[in-house]
Design a protein with these regions (language model features):
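N-terminal secretory signal peptides and thylakoid transit peptides that target proteins
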Residues: 1-18
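Phosphate-coordinating loops and pocket residues in cytosolic domains that bind phosphorylated ligands
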Residues: 12, 133, 197
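Short, glycine-/small- and polar/acidic-enriched structural segments
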Residues: 31-179, 183-189, 204-205, 215
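Short, solvent-exposed loop/beta-turn-alpha elements that line the ligand-binding surface or hinge
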Residues: 64, 209-214, 281-289
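Pocket-lining segment of extracytoplasmic ligand-binding domains
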Residues: 94-95, 171-262
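Secondary-structure end/capping motifs
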Residues: 229-308
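Conserved C-terminal helix/tail region of periplasmic/extracytoplasmic solute-binding proteins
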Residues: 301-332
Length: 332
C-alpha cells in the first residue's frame, strides 16, 4: 500500500486556528509525559466527511508530532490496513463491528461526526424497502452498511438485494447509476454531491437528517490495541487534535474547504464546502459513542450478522477513557 507523503502544511489553517485559540499548547501536556513517538499515520480514503483528520496537521504539530503522514486506503480496506500495521488510526463505522467479533484488535476511541451517507434511487423508488430485487451500487460505502440498512426495513440482506461494488473491479457503480443501468446508489461525500450536480436520481435516505441513523455517529476514530497500549500519550494527543479539528470544521466550513482542496485531499471546492456545511461536526460534544456501538451491534445481532451481544462488543472493542478526559478538558 503506497504511503502518501505529508501533505502541504495548511498554513492558513494555522492562522485560522491560532486566532481561535486552538493552537495554544494544551496546559495538560506537561502532566501527560513525553510522546512515545513523534510520527503518526492517519488515513486518506478520499472521503470528505473525515475532514477533521485532514485539517489536524498543525494541531498535531502543536501536540509535538513532527512527522505526520496520510496513508491512502479505500474505506473498506482501512481497518485491514490498521491491523497490518500500515496505519496508526483509521475511520471506523458501526457496520465494521463484525471485525471486532472476529477478533481484530481494533479499539474505537471516539465519535467524530454523524451523517454524511446518502441513498440515491431512480424514479419510482421511494423507500429502501422498494429495493427488493434491485441492484445497488457502492464505491466507498461498505457492503456491511448496505446489508444493515436492508435488514432494518425487513429485507433479507442476502436474498432480497444485489449490489455492485467498486472493489469488484468492474464498471464504476456511480456511472452505472447515472446511466440508469442499476436502480440505486449508496454514497459517501463527494459522491452524493456529484450525483446532485449531475441530476441523477433522488435521495431516499439521508443519514444526517433521517432517524434512526441521524441519532448516532457515522464516523468514529479507531486505533489498534497494540498502538494504544504502547503509545497512550500519543493516542490522547492525536484524539485531542482531531476533536479540535472537528470544532474548526463546524466553525469555519468554507475556509476548511479551501484548505482541503489546496492540500490535495479533494478537487472540487463546491462539493467540499457543501459537505462541511451539511455535517454537524459539533455533535461530537453531544452524542455518546457507546450509544452508537450499542445501536449498531444490536442491529447487526438482530439481522444475524453477528452473534455477540452489544455488551461484549463494547467491552472488547472500545476504550473511552481518553475521550472522557478530553471531554472534561475541552468543555466549552
Amino acid at each position: 500500500m503506497p504511503l502518501v507523503q505529508s501533505r502541504r502544511r495548511f498554513l492558513t489553517t494555522l492562522s485560522m486556528a491560532g486566532a481561535a485559540g486552538f493552537l495554544r499548547t494544551p496546559p495538560a501536556l506537561a502532566g501527560e509525559g513525553p510522546l512515545e513517538t513523534t510520527t503518526v499515520r492517519l488515513v486518506n480514503d478520499r472521503s470528505i466527511c473525515i475532514a477533521p483528520e485532514y485539517v489536524a496537521d498543525e494541531l498535531l504539530r502543536a501536540e509535538g508530532f513532527t512527522d505526520i503522514r496520510y496513508v491512502e486506503a479505500p474505506g473498506g480496506q482501512q481497518v485491514d490496513a490498521l491491523v497490518r500495521g500500515e496505519l496508526d488510526f483509521c475511520n471506523f463505522l458501526g457496520a465494521f463491528i463484525p471485525v471486532i467479533e472476529a477478533g481484530s484488535p481494533i479499539v474505537v476511541l471516539a465519535g467524530i461526526n454523524i451523517g454524511c451517507l446518502e441513498f440515491f434511487a431512480r424514479e419510482g423508488i421511494r423507500h429502501i424497502a422498494d429495493l427488493k430485487g434491485r441492484t445497488i451500487g457502492l464505491r466507498a460505502a461498505p457492503v456491511e452498511l448496505l446489508k444493515l440498512m436492508a435488514a432494518e426495513v425487513g429485507l433479507d440482506p442476502v436474498k432480497d438485494i444485489r449490489w455492485v461494488a467498486a472493489s469488484d473491479g468492474g464498471a464504476d457503480p456511480l456511472e452505472l447509476f447515472v446511466q440508469g443501468k442499476i436502480e440505486a446508489f449508496l454514497g459517501f461525500p463527494p459522491e452524493p454531491q456529484e450525483l446532485r450536480a449531475r441530476r441523477a436520481g433522488h435521495v431516499i435516505l439521508n443519514t444526517t437528517t433521517d432517524r434512526p441513523w441521524s441519532q448516532y455517529f457515522c464516523c468514529m476514530l479507531a486505533s489498534s490495541r497494540d498502538y494504544v497500549r504502547k503509545h497512550p500519550v500519543a493516542t490522547k494527543r492525536v484524539l485531542r487534535a482531531v476533536l479540535k479539528a472537528a470544532d474548526i470544521c463546524a466553525a469555519e466550513p468554507d475556509r476548511v474547504a479551501r484548505r482541503i482542496v489546496s492540500g490535495g485531499f479533494a478537487e472540487n471546492y463546491d462539493y467540499v464546502s457543501e459537505t462541511l456545511r451539511d455535517i454537524p461536526y459539533e455533535k461530537w460534544r453531544e452524542y455518546d459513542p457507546e450509544d452508537t456501538m450499542r445501536f449498531y451491534a444490536l442491529r447487526l445481532h438482530e439481522a444475524g450478522l453477528i452473534k455477540s451481544s452489544p455488551q461484549k462488543i463494547i467491552a472488547d472493542g472500545t476504550d473511552w477513557h481518553f475521550l472522557n478526559e478530553l471531554n472534561r478538558e475541552l468543555k466549552a
